[in-house]
Amino acid sequence: MKIAIVGTGYVGLVTGTCFAEIGVDVTCVDTNSEKIEALKKGIIPIYENGLEEMVIRNTKAGRLKFTTSLESCLDDVEVVFSAVGTPPDEDGSADLSYVLAVARTIGQNMKKYKLVVTKSTVPVGTACKVRNAIQEELDKRGAKIEFDVASNPEFLKEGNAVNDFMSPDRVVIGVESERAEKLMTKLYKPFMLNNFRVIFMDIPSAEMTKYAANSMLATRISFMNDIANLCELVGADVNMVRSGIGSDTRIGRKFVCPGIGYGGSCFPKDVKALIKTAELSGYKMRVLHAVEEVNEKQKSILFEKLQKHFNNDLEGKTIAIWGLAFKPETDDMREAPALVLIDELLKAGCKVRAYDPAAMNECRRRIGESIYYATDMYDAALDADALMLVTEWKEFRLPSWAVIKKTMEQPLVLDGRNIYDKKEMEEQGFIYHCIGK
């Protein structure tokens, strides 16, 4: 089976490479010629465990190809996946210009039946717009060619995307014809044979499922952060509360960890887009408005704790930051809490020394040389008046606290992810603040 994946960003590259891994003949398309040339050499533009090796292996095997021209491969493929970006507009709605541009290109160049599958996260109704865009181009040509549209939203976690694709919780597919369902069944047959759950539904429901899933997870995070903040006020320990409620099978243990807010390429964008979708339908998503409000406030919680400790006198203080990416195992800093924190620290007159195992170049690209980029976590802590744990990378879990204490100007640790034990930290002579206790 031959398919094309348009867009070699996070979703497109992982999707195309993983399909190639199970034997599908894949052509990945991107208009960025520099990126395509790099991919042909096995150089990938994102940090994702196991992906680079898989790209190299499947490129050598001839199952994975890269091109800047969708037109050049369109005749050869049965299915075209659209995995281009859908960045938020100023009003929070999803910008579908790239998605519709792909649809128009297909309509301008297709010569026989195609199944056009939207992989990008898009609002309900996008498939109709894609169908109309393709049909308009066919009408301009006077061409009568059958085609189908479908929705196949991704549920990949950055840092674990390859495993998520190869061993999915579920695969959601929205179709509107028997022909489209048969093609998607053929494509996902290896997953069905391994007893992974493939769920077929109508297209609007598939489009809504992605937004609903991410918004539900964002809601859990904001709820636990709200509970954590209340725990501090009433003398409860949020870690104990988390253990208590997580043991309830109706709730579970996932996404009930308090912290300094969610970030990344999905949750912030998708919550905003779902709120906007509701507004356009004359409905207000009251819960999601609160979710956003809590999250924005939570990103400043460590800074507020720091201010309180130093009685609002932060001018000239040196602050160490461990972790810049929005989560471990990625270099993604989109909507990262670290960006908010760094901005607040610099405005308060602080000097910032930061270290992240993967996101240093990305941070430098975003904010330039306004902070010191440390060589390791110990270098970041040098002469620091406070150390802030922002991203819970594994290498931060068991540092040599004796070395850290000697290195720092003041033994103050603010743990934004609750990965350290308060009693142990205090026994080692640190002043320790965390979230929710």
Can you name each region flagged by the protein language model?
Residues 1-437:
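Structural/interface elements that position substrates and couple domains in central-metabolism enzymes
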